[in-house]
Design a protein with these regions (language model features):
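A beta-strand edge to alpha-helix "cap/lid" segment located at domain peripheries
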Residues: 1-26, 30-131
Length: 131
């Protein structure tokens, strides 16, 4: 479990640095996400968005509400993410989000152990109202 939570922290750090290439290490070859713009994205799409700087954050904060290892090779993590946008691509369905705006999201991440290393397999996130 600690390995998965550390991986999640490293992914947040990479997102802050705009490190799309780092996501190559973190994402499963079969990665799929349902993102806040109600778009299904696969691994290469996500890496390209971060590598190009089309998605960028000036801050990312995560609060874990639930984390459990459901099988030897599966961990589920649920919680909230608060991000401050430093770039917003115009073709992602988030055109109304302003640079500098804070977004709150609920997320579910499913990690799978592949070839001895934990990788993010599935991500779902939904924008929630700012409290």
């Amino acid at each position: 479990m600690a390995e998965v939570l550390a991986l999640q922290d490293r992914m947040n750090d990479a997102a802050l640095r705009g490190g799309g290439a780092a996501f190559d290490e973190f994402l499963s070859k079969n990665f799929v996400a349902s993102d806040p713009s109600n778009t299904i994205r696969h691994r290469d799409d996500m890496i390209a968005l971060f590598s190009s700087g089309r998605i960028a954050y000036s801050s990312v904060k995560t609060a874990i509400d639930y984390a459990d290892q459901l099988a030897e090779d599966i961990v589920v993590v649920m919680g909230t993410e608060t991000t401050e946008q430093s770039a917003v691509p115009s073709d992602t369905g988030l055109e109304s989000v302003a640079i500098g705006e804070t977004l709150n999201r609920r997320f579910t991440n499913v990690y799978r152990k592949e070839d001895g290393a934990w990788r993010l397999l599935i991500k779902q996130s939904t924008i929630t109202p700012v409290k």
